[in-house]
């Protein structure tokens, strides 16, 4: 009997604790609602409507954030996806192309995620405006690719840029240079959400402005926001009205994410007659990709699992290249009609990413984000396609930039392809030290980009510069210790070499 009483009192105390937590949650939601209403009153008449949509979207996300506890996946339910749910690209390609490529292409809209700044590479303004090859920017190359398609097949594939409030103004200024290109370019903006104080969980912003003290009070809430923002912009309905059926979504800094006609044909003319609503391009993991999100089978559906969702005890297992062999490239093909249906049903479910930041003044804040690929489980008949590594060529650092600027790649109509002169299809591993982090410093340290056709691995650390016509082969490690400087002379050929110490070349 005493055991029963103990269990009952324990249950009652747990029930009381959960009731208390529920009251706290409701109070907090009410406080946030009041703060958001105060912020909305500071919006001008032309800002009011879209600010209200943004703040309503934030409230929904915040409500979900308060409801969720602990890791969002039950590790025991994670299974490898069934064989037929991830198709090899070779199988898709083997079907060939239809005679009417132009009619298939005319059903497509290309969307590039263009919300990021170039700050990690020491550049101001949108990352898409950084020069990556022969003075062409990411945006230039994208426009060239789509113009080439439209001219070759006499089609009308539009380009849509999802900007953020950080990139919109600068991007729009530059777009006029493409007025004479055969590409219709549209833009829409990601939502703008308020950062919240890590302790109080209340918005840091006091008004809608984005200047002065308020500059750091707002953030774009991750690319998962594309579904709501695209819908709210009116572009979704416009394209459906024009007979478009699919969007191809990718990061603008992934130079491998070109329109693939074989994948598009598979979407438009499926072999089993059943259309896919969502296709995610995945590729094989290497040791460098262990943190990338992977496709799994979860409760009978394909699901993207990110490292942040994995319980700590299973992180090493998640990183295992032998168990989880593929990762998400963020190249996605999505049905427009399905996006419209799910958005109107409020049925797009994406896990919340909680991103902790420290503002310049030292205040700890969190921002709530979502990822576009996480919505795969909300769509019907989803599919993964295991594509060649060449479709994943992101430029996140100057080490990546060195690769794409080199003779490892040739440029044709805005697309980069691996040089036929390279004997192996793999990309060299390049690690440039902190002296090369900023694009400006990086460019100053290379008189010309070295020949890297036979390179396997390059590590550079410290104060190092490269003369013209340098050739790097095999494994090359160059380390200038603190206070030393190494100048690699013009015409030098370094093959399987370690260079250290001090080597100065001065003008006579």
Swiss-Prot record:
**Assigned keywords, A-Z:** Acetylation, Cytoplasm, Disease variant, Epilepsy, Magnesium, Metal-binding, Nucleotidyltransferase, Phosphoprotein, Transferase
Disulphide bonds annotated for this chain are none
- Asked if the keyword Heme belongs to this entry, the reply reads no
Catalysed reaction per UniProt? Answer: alpha-D-glucose 1-phosphate + UTP + H(+) = UDP-alpha-D-glucose + diphosphate
List of residues binding substrate: 115-116, 223, 251-253, 330
Signal sequence region: none
- Example GO molecular function: D-glucose binding
Query: Which residues are UTP-binding?
Result: 113-116, 127, 190, 222, 253, 396
Implicated in which disease? Answer: Developmental and epileptic encephalopathy 83: A form of epileptic encephalopathy, a heterogeneous group of severe early-onset epilepsies characterized by refractory seizures, neurodevelopmental impairment, and poor prognosis. Development is normal prior to seizure onset, after which cognitive and motor delays become apparent. DEE83 is an autosomal recessive form characterized by onset of frequent, intractable seizures in the first days to months of life. Affected individuals have profound developmental delay with no motor or language skill acquisition, and poor or absent visual tracking.
Q: Identify this protein by name.
A: UTP--glucose-1-phosphate uridylyltransferase
Q: What is the species of this protein? A: Homo sapiens
């Amino acid at each position: 009997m005493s055991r029963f009483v103990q269990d009952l009192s324990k249950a009652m105390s747990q029930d009381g604790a959960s009731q208390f937590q529920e009251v706290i949650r409701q109070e907090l939601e009410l406080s946030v609602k009041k703060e958001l209403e105060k912020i909305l009153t500071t919006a001008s008449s032309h800002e009011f409507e879209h600010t209200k949509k943004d703040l309503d979207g934030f409230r929904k996300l915040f409500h979900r954030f308060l409801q969720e506890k602990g890791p969002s996946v039950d590790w025991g339910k994670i299974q490898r996806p069934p064989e037929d749910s991830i198709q090899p690209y070779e199988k898709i390609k083997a079907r060939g192309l239809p005679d009417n490529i132009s009619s298939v292409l005319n059903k497509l809209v290309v969307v590039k995620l263009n919300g990021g700044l170039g700050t990690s590479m020491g550049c101001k303004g949108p990352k898409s405006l950084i020069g990556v090859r022969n003075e062409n920017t990411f945006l230039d190359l994208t426009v060239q690719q789509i113009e080439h398609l439209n001219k070759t097949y006499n089609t009308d594939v539009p380009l849509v840029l999802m900007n953020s409030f950080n990139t919109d103004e600068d991007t729009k200024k530059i777009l006029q240079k493409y007025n004479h290109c055969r590409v219709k370019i549209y833009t829409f903006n990601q939502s703008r959400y308020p950062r919240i104080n890590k302790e109080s969980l209340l918005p840091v912003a006091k008004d809608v402005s984005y200047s002065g003290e308020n500059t750091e009070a707002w953030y774009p809430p991750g690319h998962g926001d594309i579904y709501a923002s695209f819908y709210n912009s009116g572009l979704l309905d416009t394209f459906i009205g024009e007979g478009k059926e699919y969007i191809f979504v990718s990061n603008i800094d992934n130079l491998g994410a070109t329109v693939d006609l074989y994948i598009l044909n598979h979407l438009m003319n499926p072999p089993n007659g059943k259309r896919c609503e969502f296709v995610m391009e995945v590729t094989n993991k290497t040791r460098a990709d262990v943190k990338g999100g992977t496709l799994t089978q979860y409760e009978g559906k394909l699901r993207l699992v990110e490292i942040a969702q994995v319980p700590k005890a299973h992180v090493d297992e998640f990183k295992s290249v032998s168990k989880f062999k593929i990762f998400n490239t963020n190249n996605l093909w999505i049905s427009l009609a399905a996006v419209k249906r799910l958005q109107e049903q409020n049925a797009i479910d994406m896990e919340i990413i909680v991103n902790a930041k420290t503002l310049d003044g030292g205040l700890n804040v969190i921002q709530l984000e979502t990822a576009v690929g996480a919505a795969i489980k909300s769509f019907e008949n989803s599919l993964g396609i295991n594509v060649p590594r060449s479709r994943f060529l992101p430029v996140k650092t100057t080490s990546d930039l060195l690769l794409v600027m080199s003779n490892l790649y040739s440029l044709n109509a805005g697309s980069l392809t691996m040089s036929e002169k390279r004997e192996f299809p793999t990309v060299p591993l390049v690690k440039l030290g902190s002296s090369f982090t900023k694009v400006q410093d990086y460019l100053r340290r290379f008189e010309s980009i070295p020949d890297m056709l036979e390179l396997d691995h390059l590590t550079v650390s410290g104060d190092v510069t490269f003369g013209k016509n340098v050739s790097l082969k095999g494994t090359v490690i160059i380390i200038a210790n603190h206070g030393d400087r190494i100048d690699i002379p013009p015409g030098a050929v370094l093959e399987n070499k370690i260079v250290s110490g001090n080597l100065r070349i001065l003008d006579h």
